[in-house]
């Protein structure tokens, strides 16, 4: 198994519902180390830039509106096979299809307000981490 980093967002609905601590506890119980974290309120420009690959798709404007509706938590998780394992604990994008006990099954309010985002590949994790964190904001721990 390979030690990897992945990028994670706790979305506005989960922040508003005061679920940050519960979600962080799940990350840590799953063996992840949180090596960078911060709270921010995305501007429209930041959200459009982050989700640029989805521009022109029918859900894009609603996604940007939702992601700018309140504060979010962004974090870098480190662990063995972090990208896939994080996707496994998040559950299906549509919370109606998410397995019981996954983050989306437990903390989502709707398809758009599905509580969390996670990188889908090592390459996207690197890009997404760099979008929100400078190298000196990441603190690996042994």
UniProtKB/Swiss-Prot annotation:
Protein name, entry field: Nucleoside diphosphate kinase
Active site (UniProt): 117 (pros-phosphohistidine intermediate)
SMART domains, sorted: NDK
SUPFAM superfamilies for the chain: Nucleoside diphosphate kinase, NDK (SSF54919)
Cofactor: Mg(2+)
EC category: transferase
Annotated InterPro entries: NDK-like_dom, NDK-like_dom_sf, Nucleoside_diP_kinase, Nucleoside_diP_kinase_AS
Pfam families in UniProt: NDK
Gene: ndk
EC number assigned by the record: 2.7.4.6
PROSITE patterns recorded: NDPK (PS00469), NDPK_LIKE (PS51374)
Domain of life of the organism encoding this protein: Bacteria
Organism in which the protein naturally occurs: Yersinia pestis
Subunit structure: Homotetramer.
């Amino acid at each position: 198994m390979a030690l990897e980093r992945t990028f994670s967002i706790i979305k506005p609905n989960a922040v508003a519902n005061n679920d940050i601590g519960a979600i962080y506890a799940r990350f840590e119980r799953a063996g992840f180390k949180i090596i960078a974290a911060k709270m921010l309120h995305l501007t429209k420009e930041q959200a459009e830039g982050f989700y640029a690959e989805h521009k022109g798709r029918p859900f894009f404007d609603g996604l940007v509106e939702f992601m700018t509706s309140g504060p979010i938590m962004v974090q870098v998780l480190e662990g063995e096979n972090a990208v896939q394992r994080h996707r496994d604990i998040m559950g299906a994008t549509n919370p109606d299809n998410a397995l019981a006990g996954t983050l989306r099954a437990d903390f989502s309010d709707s398809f758009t307000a599905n509580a969390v985002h996670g990188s889908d590949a090592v390459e996207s994790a690197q890009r997404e981490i760099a979008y929100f964190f400078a190298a000196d904001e990441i603190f690996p721990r042994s």
